[in-house]
Curated annotation (Swiss-Prot):
One of its GO terms (molecular function) is poly(A) RNA polymerase activity. Its EC number is 2.7.7.19. The active site is at D192, D194. Keywords: ATP-binding, mRNA processing, Nucleotide-binding, Transcription, Transferase. Polymerase that creates the 3'-poly(A) tail of mRNA's. This is Poly(A) polymerase catalytic subunit. Belongs to the poxviridae poly(A) polymerase catalytic subunit family. One of its GO terms (biological process) is mRNA processing. Heterodimer of a large (catalytic) subunit and a small (regulatory) subunit. Pfam families: Pox_polyA_pol, Pox_polyA_pol_C, Pox_polyA_pol_N. It comes from the Viruses. The gene is PAPL. It catalyses: RNA(n) + ATP = RNA(n)-3'-adenine ribonucleotide + diphosphate. It comes from Myxoma virus (strain Lausanne).
Length: 470
C-alpha cells in the first residue's frame, strides 16, 4: 500500500481501508482530496442563502440544514459496499466541484437587467388560432392521464430559482415552451419551466442536493430510455419537479434564440414548427380536446410573433402547404413532395422507425448526416435530391390511404425545422404553412399509425440509496 493514499482513505472512511477498499478506491484519491479539503462551512452558508432566496416557505431550520449537509459528507464512514462508496464519491465530487458555480452563484447580485419591450398582443389573431384549433380538435378522449400532469408542490420554488438560473447561465441554458411564451405574452400560463442545456446532469444533481438539504426529503433523478438525453427530477411522492434535455454545445450554437429580460428563449418560429409536429401526436390532440383555450393562447402568441418578424400576410393563401405525403404502411416510410419550394432536395423520405433510417444511412455510405438531438428529435441527411429523416410522432390518416392534413402539416414543419437549423431562408414556406391553418374543415381521424417503440431501462440516481445507473 502507498502510505500516503492509505492515510487519505483512512481519513475519508474514518477507518483503516481494507485491502479491497484500498485497491478499488486508490484511483479516486484526487477526488477524495478535493472532498476532504472542501470548505463545508462556506457550502452550508450557500445552501442557507439559496433557501432564503428561493425556498423561504420551507420550515427546515439552519441547524437542521447543517446537520443534513455534514451527515451526507460523512456518509461514507458507515458504508462498506464498494459500489455505494463509488456512488458517494462521484456525487460528493460533483457537489464540491460544481455547486458554487452552478447554483451558489445565484445568491450573489446579478448583472443589471434590461427589461425587454418585446410583448405581443394577440387580440387580432386569436380568432384565427381558435378556428385552426377547432378544425384540429378531432381526437376521441381517453381516460389515460399522462405522468407530466403529476406536479410537485416544489415547482413554484424551483421556477423562481430557474428564472435566475436562466439569466446567469444564458450561454449554456435556454428555455422553450409555455414559460418562454409567457415572457412574450403574459396571458400565457405556465407550469414548470422547460429548458435545454449543455450540462443537464450536473445541474440536476446539484439541484437534487439543494432540495434534499433544505427539505430533508429525498428526490430522485430518472433517465427515460425513449427520450434522448432527457432527465427528470421527481420528489419522494414521484411527482414531477423539473426536467431537462441535454444538448451538445454545437447544437446550442445553431438554435436561433431571442433575448428577453436577460433570458434566451428558443426562437418562437422554431417553437411554432414544434407545435405543428406536436399535433400529430394523438395524446396531444387529446390535450387539445380537454383544454382548447390553453393551446389557443399559445398558438396565437407564436403566430403573432411569426407574423410580425417574417411579415406574414394572413390571407389563407397556402400555395404548396402543407406538403403532401404518401405512406407505405409496410415499410413505415412517408414520401413527401417538396418540389414546390426552392430547397436543396425535391422530396423527403420520412421514416417512422429510427433504426430503419440509421440502417439506410449506413447503406448510403454517407457521413454528412446532421443530428440536432432533442431540438428536432431526428438526424437529417441530404443525398442527391432526397432529404432523409425520422419522425417520432404518430401519423394520422383521414381515410385508409390518405394522410390527415394534421400530419402533413406536422411533417412539413419537421422539414422546415431542418431548413431553420441549417440557416436556410424559410420565409415563403413558413408563410404558406401558417396560412394553411386558415379556412379548414374538421376532418375525423380514420386511423392512427403508432409511433416508433423505444426500448430500454430507466436510469436512476438515488442520493438516499447511493444508486447511480446512468
Amino acid at each position: 500500500m502507498n502510505a500516503r493514499i492509505a492515510e487519505l482513505l483512512h481519513n475519508y472512511l474514518g477507518r483503516p481501508p481494507s485491502l479491497s477498499e484500498y485497491h478499488m478506491l486508490k484511483l479516486q484519491h484526487r477526488n477524495i482530496q478535493k472532498i476532504i479539503a472542501f470548505n463545508k462551512d462556506i457550502f452550508i452558508s450557500l445552501i442557507k442563502k439559496n433557501k432564503k432566496k428561493f425556498f423561504s416557505d420551507i420550515d427546515l431550520t439552519s441547524s437542521e440544514i447543517k446537520t443534513s449537509v455534514l451527515s451526507y459528507f460523512s456518509k461514507q464512514r458507515d458504508t462498506y459496499s464498494i459500489g455505494k462508496l463509488y456512488t458517494i464519491i462521484e456525487l460528493q465530487t460533483i457537489l464540491v466541484s460544481t455547486y458554487t458555480d452552478v447554483l451558489g452563484v445565484l445568491t450573489l447580485k446579478g448583472p443589471d437587467m434590461f427589461p425587454s419591450s418585446t410583448r405581443y398582443d394577440i387580440k387580432s389573431i386569436k380568432q384565427i388560432a381558435t378556428s385552426a384549433l377547432h378544425a384540429m380538435n378531432v381526437a376521441v378522449l381517453s381516460d389515460k392521464v399522462m405522468g407530466r400532469h403529476n406536479v410537485s408542490p416544489l415547482v413554484s420554488n424551483v421556477n423562481a430559482l430557474m428564472e435566475e438560473y436562466l439569466r446567469r447561465h444564458n450561454k449554456n441554458c435556454i428555455c422553450y415552451g409555455s414559460y418562454s411564451l409567457h415572457l412574450l405574452n403574459p396571458e400565457v400560463k405556465y407550469g414548470d419551466i422547460d429548458i435545454l442545456q449543455t450540462n443537464s446532469r450536473t445541474f440536476l444533481i446539484d439541484l437534487a442536493f439543494l432540495i434534499k438539504f433544505i427539505t430533508g426529503s429525498n428526490v430522485i433523478l430518472l433517465k427515460v430510455p425513449y427520450l434522448k438525453n432527457y432527465m427528470v427530477l421527481k420528489d419522494k411522492d414521484d411527482n414531477h419537479i423539473i426536467d431537462s434535455f441535454n444538448i451538445r454545445q454545437e447544437t446550442m450554437q445553431v438554435i436561433p434564440k431571442v433575448l428577453i429580460d436577460n433570458i434566451y428563449i428558443v426562437d418562437p418560429a422554431l417553437q411554432l414548427m414544434s407545435m405543428f409536429k406536436m399535433f400529430s401526436q394523438i395524446d396531444r390532440l387529446e390535450d387539445l380536446a380537454r383544454n382548447p383555450e390553453k393551446l389557443t393562447v399559445r398558438l396565437a402568441t407564436l403566430m403573432e410573433y411569426v407574423r410580425v418578424k417574417y411579415g406574414v400576410i394572413l390571407n389563407g393563401e397556402s400555395n404548396h402547404m402543407p406538403m403532401k405525403g404518401v405512406l407505405d404502411k409496410d415499410k413505415r416510410i412517408i414520401v413527401m413532395d417538396t418540389s414546390g419550394y426552392n430547397f436543396s432536395f425535391k422530396k423527403c423520405f420520412v421514416y417512422m422507425d429510427e433504426s430503419s433510417l440509421s440502417s439506410d444511412i449506413l447503406d448510403l455510405n454517407a457521413d454528412d448526416a446532421v443530428d440536432f438531438e432533442n431540438v428536432s428529435n431526428s438526424a437529417y441527411l441530404v443525398k442527391g435530391d432526397v432529404l432523409y429523416t425520422y419522425f417520432s410522432n404518430t401519423i394520422l390518416l383521414s381515410d385508409p390511404d390518405t394522410i390527415h392534413e394534421i400530419s402533413n402539416k406536422a411533417m412539413s414543419a419537421h422539414i422546415l425545422i431542418y431548413q431553420i437549423l441549417t440557416g436556410n431562408d424559410i420565409r415563403q414556406p413558413l408563410s404558406d404553412l401558417v396560412n394553411s391553418l386558415m379556412y379548414n374543415e374538421k376532418v375525423l381521424i380514420h386511423e392512427v399509425i403508432p409511433r416508433d417503440k423505444k426500448t430500454g431501462k430507466h436510469g436512476i440516481i438515488d442520493i438516499e440509496k447511493d444508486i447511480i445507473t446512468h
